């Protein structure tokens, strides 16, 4: 096989087009990022800020605990004095039990698993499944004051003006 250099012997420009094309950067439209806003074509705007950054004050961290963890650990929680057993039912505050509840803003009970005993649970938020499982077993799911204010805030529509 012959080399490219050998094949192009006798050719004046060696595949570079006309004699003007390989002189300077003019054939390429300038050097580097020259012409980025004028004569260069691009599929995106590479200059400036893009997107949205959520304000840190609007972010909430959520500590999650499942109803199965509450159900299976109810007797242990009573032994550790983080819950109470009264009239055949366990009274549990999920904020005292969730692993990362101290460092989070909200404690939420999720509906993963089964509930076999009567639980009266206090938490900032409940999933619909968790609330149903707890109440079907004869217990109750009670929101904290913080949880009630969060629930009211989610039900309201933002920027609702009824004056028009």
UniProtKB/Swiss-Prot annotation:
TM annotation in the entry: none
Ligase keyword on record: no
Biased composition (Basic residues): 1-33
One Gene Ontology CC term in the entry: large ribosomal subunit
Residue ranges with Acidic residues bias: 153-164
Keyword terms: Ribonucleoprotein, Ribosomal protein, RNA-binding, rRNA-binding
Region ranges (Disordered): 1-59, 137-164
Gene3D superfamilies recorded: 3.100.10.10, 4.10.990.10
Disulfide bonds listed in the record: none
Keyword check for rRNA-binding: yes
GO biological process assignments: translation
One Pfam family linked to the record: Ribosomal_L27A
HAMAP family: Ribosomal_uL15 (MF_01341)
Assembly description: Part of the 50S ribosomal subunit.
Protein name, per record: Large ribosomal subunit protein uL15
Species whose genome carries this gene: Haloquadratum walsbyi (strain DSM 16790 / HBSQ001)
């Amino acid at each position: 096989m012959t080399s490219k250099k050998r094949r192009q012997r006798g050719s004046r420009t060696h595949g570079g087009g006309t004699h003007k094309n390989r002189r300077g950067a003019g054939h390429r439209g300038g050097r580097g990022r020259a012409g980025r806003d004028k004569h260069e074509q691009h599929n995106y705007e590479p200059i400036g800020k893009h997107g949205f950054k959520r304000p840190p004050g609007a972010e909430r961290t959520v500590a999650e605990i499942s109803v199965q963890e509450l159900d299976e650990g109810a007797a242990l929680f009573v032994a550790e004095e983080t819950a109470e057993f009264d009239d055949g039912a366990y009274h549990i505050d999920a904020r005292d039990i969730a692993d990362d509840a101290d460092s989070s803003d909200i404690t939420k009970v999720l509906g993963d698993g089964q509930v076999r005993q009567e639980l009266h649970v206090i938490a900032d938020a409940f999933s619909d499944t968790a609330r149903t499982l707890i109440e079907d077993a004869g217990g109750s799911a009670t929101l904290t004051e913080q949880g009630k204010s969060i629930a009211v805030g989610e039900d309201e529509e933002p920027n609702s003006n009824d004056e028009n």
